[in-house]
């Protein structure tokens, strides 16, 4: 099972025929189901087997069996869960189909000899994950529904998709001034050590409640005492609102909350801060702040990060444009 998951994880790094029956009431054979059309993209069909045999679907089924048992997918609840997962994976297959079509249009598909060579290289990289143990590699292929041939075809598609993405994003550039601007606006991200703050808060539902709390605190009432009385954060209420040490870059907290907390000086108490959870009164018990690294020492890392973000933005915009211009039809009834 671990070997299968390992292969699926590698394969899932990628971007991720028509059947005739006299009547819908007639039960299709497994072969007919596999060949049934689940989508058409500019006239090209995506068959159910393309979805069922995909690494993403194999990974989903493996996870479902591990968590819920072998029989879960046969239940009504299981079928509904699997159908929803299939709909999401189908959307990815449609995106891949559009990209493969654009590969032909943009003339970025390598010649067969070169494409085979690149695919073989990727196969060898996957084998290296298994320490080049051919038997273990073949056993894992079998358990994930692949043969050597179908794996290679899958990888060839991923190579083409990668080349299309590279073509779309090749002109993306980031100037030094862009990096400098980002550095100036986010200096707390570039300290010698991560800046941290010890934080307490009081959470209430309404702004009026928050103003009343702030008034009590301005009158020098004890923060922890007030938190225990009125805070609606069950995780910190009994600790006097204490959240503990938080890194400035911690993404587990609401961005608005973090921005307000970082702006406060040590010992300060905020005005009401509104987030998706309600209204907070934030207290900074202490801070540990470190010197900021010089711009030149982090410039290239910033440019690399900004370039990746711009490339992702350019790719997302282009694929949405291509899909909107494509003729796409789905057949959800054939998913199960």
Swiss-Prot record:
Compartments where located: Cell membrane
Keyword Nucleus attached: no
Key words, A-Z: Cell membrane, Isomerase, Lipoprotein, Membrane, Palmitate, Rotamase, Signal
Membrane topology per record: Lipid-anchor
Annotated lipid attachment (S-diacylglycerol cysteine): 23
Single GO biological process annotation from the record: protein folding
HAMAP family in the record: Foldase_PrsA
Function: Plays a major role in protein secretion by helping the post-translocational extracellular folding of several secreted proteins.
Protein name, as recorded: Foldase protein PrsA
């Amino acid at each position: 099972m671990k070997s299968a998951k390992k292969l699926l994880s590698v394969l899932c790094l990628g971007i991720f025929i028509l059947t005739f029956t006299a009547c819908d009431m007639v039960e299709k054979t497994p072969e007919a189901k596999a060949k049934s059309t689940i989508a058409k993209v500019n006239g090209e069909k995506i068959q159910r087997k393309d979805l069922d045999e995909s690494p993403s679907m194999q990974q989903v089924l493996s996870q479902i069996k591990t968590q819920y048992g072998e029989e879960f997918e046969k239940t009504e609840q299981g079928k509904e869960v699997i159908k929803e997962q299939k709909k999401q994976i189908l959307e990815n297959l449609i995106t891949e189909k559009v990209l493969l079509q654009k590969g032909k249009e943009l003339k970025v598909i390598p010649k067969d000899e070169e494409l085979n060579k690149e695919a073989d290289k990727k196969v060898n990289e996957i084998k290296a994950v298994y320490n080049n143990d051919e038997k273990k590699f073949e056993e894992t292929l079998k358990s994930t529904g692949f043969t050597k041939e179908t794996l290679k075809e899958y990888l060839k598609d991923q190579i083409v998709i990668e080349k299309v993405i590279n073509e779309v994003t090749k002109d993306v550039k980031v100037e030094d001034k862009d990096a400098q601007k980002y550095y100036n606006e986010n200096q707390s991200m570039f300290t010698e050590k991560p800046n941290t703050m010890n934080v307490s808060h009081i959470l209430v539902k309404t702004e009026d409640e928050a103003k009343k709390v702030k008034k009590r605190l301005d009158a020098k009432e004890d923060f922890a005492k007030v938190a225990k009385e009125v805070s609606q954060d069950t995780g910190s209420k009994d600790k006097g609102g204490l959240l503990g040490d938080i890194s400035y870059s911690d993404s587990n907290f609401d961005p608005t909350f973090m921005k307000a907390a970082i702006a406060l000086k040590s010992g300060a108490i905020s005005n009401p801060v509104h987030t998706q959870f309600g209204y907070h009164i934030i207290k900074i018990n202490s801070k540990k702040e470190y010197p900021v690294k010089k711009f030149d020492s982090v410039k290239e890392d910033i440019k690399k990060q900004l370039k990746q973000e711009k490339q992702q933005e350019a790719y997302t915009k282009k694929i949405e444009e291509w899909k909107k211009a494509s003729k796409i039809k789905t057949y959800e009834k054939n998913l199960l």
